[in-house]
């Protein structure tokens, strides 16, 4: 990782020089947003969807993005760091004003960075991931809109650290008692040939949007809705989606999840979804 080249504020630099200052509001106040796009076999996947979400998130948090050619930067990063299966990170965060006053937000400069690094699955050995439905609470949309990506993972981290001993990760609920998402992934439920995923208090992930595409192109039904914890026991199958793991099996996955994985892999090679680098 230390020998990678990144991009920050108009320059290509060693990745170790692309991060925030410890005084930056993006670091001490989570005043930042980001997005992560996968590269499969040297091709960017769902570039427009990731960029559109990144731009929308930056607008939501009032972080002014520079006028840059994103694809050009990605191609140069890929040229300098030729990793065929990777992540591209887009990041923007608020720096600190000369006054140092945390209320002097308007005078804090905006920093923008991008970098590429090797990808990793949710579980290194590719085995199903064991997921626990936690009674921990996800931050509500009424506090800040969870469809805008943010750096505030504290509720995920806290509950991940106290998960059951036989589980790899957790899914949180909201204050109304509905299932939301896990740290870095959406959750999908298969029940009676329908696919359900949470509607509120969660990120609407790009990978889950590809699952929705699969259902539109094939005889399957997809619905975003409020999901009670009972579904955890009723569902025929449970799967996870993320930019890092694509469609990932859990201890509750079966043939439908395997079919979704096959369809997803097809799309990682399809011209409608990929961009040449």
Which functions belong to the PLM regions below?
Residues 79-92, 99:
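Ordered, amphipathic secondary-structure segments that act as subunit-interaction surfaces
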Residues 1-76, 98, 103-277:
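Helix-start/capping segments and mature chain N-termini
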């Amino acid at each position: 990782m230390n020998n990678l080249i990144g991009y920050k504020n108009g320059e290509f630099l060693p990745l170790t020089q692309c991060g925030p200052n410890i005084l930056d509001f993006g670091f001490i106040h989570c005043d930042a947003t980001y997005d992560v796009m996968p590269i499969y076999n040297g091709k960017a996947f769902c570039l427009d969807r990731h960029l559109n979400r990144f731009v929308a998130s930056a607008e939501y948090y009032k972080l002014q993005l520079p006028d840059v050619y994103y694809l050009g930067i990605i191609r140069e990063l890929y040229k300098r760091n030729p990793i065929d299966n990777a992540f591209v990170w887009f990041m923007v965060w608020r720096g600190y004003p000369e006054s140092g006053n945390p209320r002097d937000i308007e005078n804090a400069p905006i920093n923008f960075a991008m970098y590429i690094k090797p990808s990793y699955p949710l579980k290194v050995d590719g085995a199903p991931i064991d997921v626990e439905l936690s009674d921990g609470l996800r931050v509500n949309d009424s506090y800040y809109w969870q469809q805008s990506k943010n750096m505030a993972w504290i509720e995920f981290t806290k509950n991940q650290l106290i998960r059951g001993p036989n589980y790899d990760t957790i899914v949180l609920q909201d204050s109304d008692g509905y299932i939301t998402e896990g740290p870095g992934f959406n959750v999908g439920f298969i029940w009676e040939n329908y696919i359900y995923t949470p509607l509120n208090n969660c990120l609407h992930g790009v990978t889950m949007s590809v699952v929705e595409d699969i259902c539109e192109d094939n005889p399957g039904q997809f619905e975003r809705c409020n999901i009670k914890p009972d579904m955890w026991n009723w569902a025929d199958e449970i799967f996870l989606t993320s930019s890092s793991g694509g469609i990932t099996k859990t201890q509750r996955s079966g043939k439908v999840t395997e079919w979704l994985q096959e369809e997803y892999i097809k799309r990682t090679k399809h011209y409608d979804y990929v961009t040449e680098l």
